Each structure stands twice: as structure tokens, then as C-alpha cells.
């Protein structure tokens, strides 16, 4: 978790120097600064999670769902994801444990970032959402 708070300002600086960042609807995020919420955007690019976490408010950790294949790319990336608190979604009974953990985190006021389609859609079209988002929202 310490890595999360060290890398967040660094990433913010790099992305604001290298990219023109424009966040739409940021005022809606400010409304829930002190409450738990679920952010469920369309997933177009591999860099989406980074931009979303950076555009969030400082000092608030965001739980990010990541599909298991991302944890299998290499050891360094797996270590990085774990240090940042990413939740590995495997699609098995472990998913129920993740859902329970996520519901508790939302109730405790944390923010969850989940891409409901479970994958990227590079053309920007919406894919059918997976059921996990709805289960979490209903229980939280």
C-alpha cells in the first residue's frame, strides 16, 4: 500500500506532463469523497485504470479489479499490482471472497474501480457487463 501512495503523485506528474488530461464528470466524484462508491467506466485502453486513479482525489485509495491474466504477465507486474492493492479476479470461488471484501470496503467508505465488461473494447462500443458489478452494488 505504501507503493500506491508513492507512485500516485509520480504517475500524476508524468501523465500531466506527457498527456493532456481532461476529466468529464469530476464534480460527481467530489460529491462522494467521504463515502464509498463504485466507478464503472467503459474500458477502451490499457491505460484507463491509471488515468482514472490519477483523476481521483488525493489521499483516497481506490480498489481496482484486475483480471487474472494481468497477474500472469511477469513477476514484477504481479508484485506491482499486489503492492497497489489490485484485486485479482479469477472467475472462481475466490471471486466470492473478493466480492465480500469489496462490499465491506465500499461500506467502509472506500472507492472501487471496476470495468463491468471485464475486458477492453478498443472501438469504444459497450460490451455486455459481467454480473459481479451488480452483485457488489446490490450488497453494498
Tell where the protein language model's regions lie, with residue ranges.
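Helix-enriched interaction subdomains in cytosolic or periplasmic regions
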Residues: 1-11
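Soluble catalytic domains of membrane acyltransferases
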Residues: 8, 17-140
